[in-house]
């Protein structure tokens, strides 16, 4: 799931903007 993946990245990188 791309949305789940982007959520993980968003949590892993603080201050990063959500991809979706």
Curated annotation (Swiss-Prot):
Cofactors: Ca(2+)
Compartments (UniProt record): Secreted
GO terms, molecular function: phospholipase A2 activity
Tissues in which the UniProt entry reports expression: Expressed by the venom gland.
Binding note for cofactor: Binds 1 Ca(2+) ion.
GO cellular component labels: extracellular region
Class of enzymatic activity (EC top level): hydrolase
GO BP, sorted A to Z: lipid catabolic process
Major place of residence: secreted
Keywords (A to Z) from UniProt: Calcium, Hydrolase, Lipid degradation, Lipid metabolism, Secreted
Its EC number(s): 3.1.1.4
Similarity comment: Belongs to the phospholipase A2 family. Group I subfamily.
Role according to the record: Snake venom phospholipase A2 (PLA2) that exhibits weak enzymatic activity. PLA2 catalyzes the calcium-dependent hydrolysis of the 2-acyl groups in 3-sn-phosphoglycerides.
Name under which the protein is recorded: Phospholipase A2 II-5b
Species this chain originates from: Notechis scutatus scutatus
Organism placement in taxonomy: Eukaryota, Metazoa, Chordata, Craniata, Vertebrata
């Amino acid at each position: 799931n791309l949305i789940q993946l982007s959520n993980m990245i968003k949590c892993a990188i603080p201050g990063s903007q959500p991809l979706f």
